[in-house]
């Protein structure tokens, strides 16, 4: 069969969108908005902790992000609602000749809580990953946000020798900046092995929790046994607790973050931690 010259045999890149919303109805958090375009969606909402906390698992069926792809995710948590968003597995950014993009917009209304707890991001050598995250908190809204990034695939003998990983994160409360961070990591750069950079570690992770805790609780978190060899620490900033670590494997970094999350969640968010089942599959 002869096809016209202008017939596309495949789509070279994806532009996917996901828009989520949550509201509080009586004593239950329910989805109020769920719109998707392209290969980005959520599974059925879950209530592992009871009706107050609505859990959604964000799924990207292609399994990886390639050059030219763009993922746009937005979520709004209405007043007094509680949403927990996670993922079924690692997000993979493949080697590519052109950049790929992810834009994340999160809005949390007064009295509401949002937990953004995806599994790790794996950035292949020669990938060109560019991520932008903007989080707006209103009134006394609460946030738990983490990010685990693995550069290259050391288990397969692949170092992050070429390409780049670029990340931009802003968190504001009622328009006032709480956290601003820009990262640009170049494949093969000397900072990957430098003591003032990643010091030879291939995984770095950050946990951000709104609120303030006692010095005793911070010390208790610091004294937790770490998966070897993880190097991590915590800092109390005005209105924000920051936990960061370096590791050789994403599994170890995530295990450390989960420990910190279990310790801090009751104090800062007001509920005991319940590990999502999807993390164990």
Swiss-Prot record:
| Molecular functions (GO terms) | nickel cation binding
> What's the stated role of this polypeptide?
Required for maturation of urease via the functional incorporation of the urease nickel metallocenter.
What are its GO cellular component terms?
A: cytoplasm
Alphabetized Pfam families for the sequence: UreD (PF01774)
Q: Which family does it belong to?
A: Belongs to the UreD family.
Q: What is this protein called?
A: Urease accessory protein UreD
Q: Which gene name belongs to this protein?
A: ureD
Question: Which keywords belong to this entry?
Answer: Chaperone, Cytoplasm, Nickel insertion
Q: Which organism is it from?
A: Pseudomonas savastanoi pv. phaseolicola (strain 1448A / Race 6)
Q: State the source organism's domain of life.
A: Bacteria
The protein's assembly and partners: UreD, UreF and UreG form a complex that acts as a GTP-hydrolysis-dependent molecular chaperone, activating the urease apoprotein by helping to assemble the nickel containing metallocenter of UreC. The UreE protein probably delivers the nickel.
Entries under InterPro entries matching the protein? UreD
Where is it located? Cytoplasm
- Name the PANTHER family for this protein: UREASE ACCESSORY PROTEIN D (PTHR33643:SF1)
């Amino acid at each position: 069969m002869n096809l016209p010259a202008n017939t596309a045999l495949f789509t070279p890149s994806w532009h996917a969108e996901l828009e989520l919303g949550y509201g509080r109805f009586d004593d239950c958090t329910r989805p109020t908005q769920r719109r998707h375009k392209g290969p980005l969606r959520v599974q059925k909402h879950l209530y592992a902790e009871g009706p107050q906390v609505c859990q959604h698992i964000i799924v990207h069926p292609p399994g990886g992000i390639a050059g030219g792809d763009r993922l746009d995710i937005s979520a709004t948590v209405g007043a007094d609602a509680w949403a927990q968003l996670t993922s079924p597995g690692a997000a993979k950014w493949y080697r590519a000749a052109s950049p790929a993009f992810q834009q994340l917009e999160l809005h949390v209304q007064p009295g509401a809580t949002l937990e953004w707890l995806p599994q790790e991001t794996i950035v292949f050598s020669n990938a060109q990953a560019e991520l932008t995250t903007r989080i707006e908190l209103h009134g006394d809204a609460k946030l738990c946000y983490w990010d685990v990034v693995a550069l290259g695939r050391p288990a397969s003998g692949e170092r992050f020798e070429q390409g780049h990983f670029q990340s931009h994160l802003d968190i504001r409360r009622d328009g006032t900046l709480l956290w601003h961070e820009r990262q640009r990591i170049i494949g093969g750069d000397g900072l990957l092995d430098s003591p003032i950079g990643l010091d030879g570690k291939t995984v770095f992770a950050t946990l951000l929790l709104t609120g303030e805790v006692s010095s005793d609780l911070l010390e208790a978190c610091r004294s937790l046994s770490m998966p070897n060899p993880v190097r991590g620490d915590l800092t109390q900033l005005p209105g924000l607790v920051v936990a960061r670590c370096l590791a050789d494997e994403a599994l170890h970094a995530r295990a450390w973050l989960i420990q910190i999350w279990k310790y801090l969640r009751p104090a800062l968010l007001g509920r005991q931690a319940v590990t999502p089942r999807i993390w164990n599959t």
